[in-house]
């Protein structure tokens, strides 16, 4: 059976370098690879199906090219994968264009936003036959065998006789080792490693990809939908399976990989085993992770650095304990400072801090405290983004109860908190304080961490011509 998989992107979250094509002729993209559809492609191919992937970041495959390929090759199923509410409008447009030119092909939506809003999505976008909820590997294998009658396919939302039907949820799969490595070679794109800065900066020109070694995060941060999507559970692949994929990547020419786990630092024994496996296999591939500052695995930072972990990114959010508590981060400023310093002392090359501004109940003094706090941390890079609220997060539910958002009419939207929450500072104040704070922060870094700042600028400037 022939299946098409399309990764739908919000144009804000990727960029094309000035030199768009690599020497091998493949298009280069500054952004993360679509690991979701790559994983599904590998599963489908192992089961004997044919699979073709498209990524909307590729300028060679705009919507009309994808639609022409669908009409010419007549796949049995076209799956559109998208991450969040920001890419949902683009998925709707493509689905309606596909349906306008082909009344027979089966269409499916998948991804976090689709999973959390399945019935509403099906009602708003009737052109789509199936909305798939949760993990997709076994779901898509079951679905392709029952396209005409998905009654028995757990995790699917569909319609019959004009009525939306929500099949029971799938049992969350804990054995992640059973799935093959993602199909990274069939999509003719090369991804450029870049930092998540307001102005994306190229980090290296090594062949780059992403991996997922675990799924989920059990912490209750009010702005995050991950605990709801993963039912508050954390699931992980075995160290042996992770090291085997790293070895596979190095053998195929990859020099750098970023783990897109929501919280890599959760299980120290597993981390230790992964580092030992990398050392025993004598791998040289570099890798990066995200994690919480209160992780008990910080004593393993030296082992991670020895195993070529180059980047650690922390969700710091604020330099005000009041705001951290308001966001239910369950971390302290002391833990932030300890984690960042431990990572740098261990030899982690790049330590990044994610911060939010425009938070509920945040004052100008809180914002200034955040920039002052950031200036004293030995961070290599940092980002300060306006806090947004999405359906599926605890903060959204709070705003529904407070009458700030309408569940019936706003479910597919997202808002900057400062646009709707009267306890937030006005947007113009946030932008002014942020601009002033960044100026002070950069000056502080230059004078107090000159070597660190010089090394970072040298790294970025080295690759600026490709942008």
Model regions and ranges:
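C-terminal accessory regions of radical SAM enzymes
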Residues: 2-22, 157-160, 164-166, 350, ...
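Glycine-rich beta-alpha loop elements in corrinoid/cobalamin-binding modules
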Residues: 36, 40-175, 386-388, 392
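Short, solvent-exposed turn/loop segments enriched in Gly/Ser/Thr/Pro and often Arg
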Residues: 57, 260-267, 292-293, 356-361, ...
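Short catalytic helix/loop segments, enriched in acidic residues and glycine
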Residues: 20-41
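Radical SAM [4Fe-4S] cluster-binding motif and immediate context
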Residues: 32, 183-354, 372
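Hydrophobic/aromatic residues located in beta-strands of well-ordered beta-sheets
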Residues: 3, 107, 153-154, 257, ...
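N-terminal [4Fe-4S]-dependent radical SAM core
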Residues: 9-19, 24, 159-210
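Catalytic cores of alpha/beta
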Residues: 118-124, 300, 361-375
């Amino acid at each position: 059976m022939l299946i098409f998989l399309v990764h739908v992107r919000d144009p804000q979250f990727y960029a094309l370098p000035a030199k768009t094509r690599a020497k091998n002729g493949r298009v280069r993209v500054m952004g993360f690879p679509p690991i979701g559809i790559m994983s599904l492609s590998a599963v489908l191919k192992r089961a004997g199906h044919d699979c073709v992937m498209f990524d909307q970041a590729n300028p060679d495959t705009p919507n009309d090219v994808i639609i022409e390929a669908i009409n010419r090759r007549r796949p049995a199923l076209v799956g559109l994968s998208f991450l969040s509410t920001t890419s949902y409008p683009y998925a709707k447009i493509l689905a309606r264009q596909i349906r306008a030119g082909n009344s027979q092909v089966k269409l499916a939506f998948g991804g976090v936003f689709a999973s959390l809003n399945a019935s509403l999505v099906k009602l708003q976008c009737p052109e789509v036959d199936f909305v798939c909820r949760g993990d997709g590997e076994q779901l898509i294998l079951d679905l392709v065998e029952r396209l005409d009658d998905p009654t028995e396919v757990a995790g699917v939302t569909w319609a019959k006789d004009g009525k939306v039907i929500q099949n029971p949820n799938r049992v969350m799969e804990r054995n992640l080792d059973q799935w093959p490595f993602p199909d990274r070679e069939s999509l003719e794109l090369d991804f450029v490693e870049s930092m998540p800065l307001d102005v994306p900066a190229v980090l290296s020109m090594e062949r780059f990809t992403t991996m997922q070694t675990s799924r989920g995060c059990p912490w209750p941060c009010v702005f995050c939908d991950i605990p709801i999507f993963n039912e508050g559970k954390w699931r992980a692949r075995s160290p042996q399976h992770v090291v085997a994929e790293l070895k596979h990547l190095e053998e195929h020419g990859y020099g750098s990989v970023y783990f897109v786990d929501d919280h890599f630092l959760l299980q120290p024994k597993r981390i230790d085993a992964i580092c030992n496996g990398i050392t025993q296999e004598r791998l040289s591939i570099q890798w990066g992770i995200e994690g919480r500052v209160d992780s008990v695995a910080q004593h393993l930072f030296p082992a991670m650095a020895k195993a070529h972990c180059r980047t650690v990114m922390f969700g710091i959010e604020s330099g005000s304990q009041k705001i951290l508590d308001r966001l239910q981060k369950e971390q302290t400023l002391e833990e932030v400072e300890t984690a960042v310093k431990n990572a740098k002392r261990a030899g982690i090359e790049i330590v990044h801090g994610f911060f939010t501004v425009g938070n509920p109940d945040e004052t100008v003094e809180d914002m200034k405290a955040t920039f002052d706090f950031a200036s004293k941390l030995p961070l290599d890079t940092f980002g300060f983004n306006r806090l947004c609220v999405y359906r599926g997060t605890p903060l959204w539910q709070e705003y529904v109860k407070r009458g700030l958002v309408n569940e019936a009419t706003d479910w597919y939207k997202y808002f900057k908190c400062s646009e709707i929450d009267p306890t937030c500072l006005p947007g113009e104040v946030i932008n002014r304080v942020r601009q002033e704070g960044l100026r002070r922060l950069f000056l502080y870094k230059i004078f107090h961490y000159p070597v660190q700042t010089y090394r970072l600028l040298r790294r970025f400037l080295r690759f600026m011509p490709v942008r």
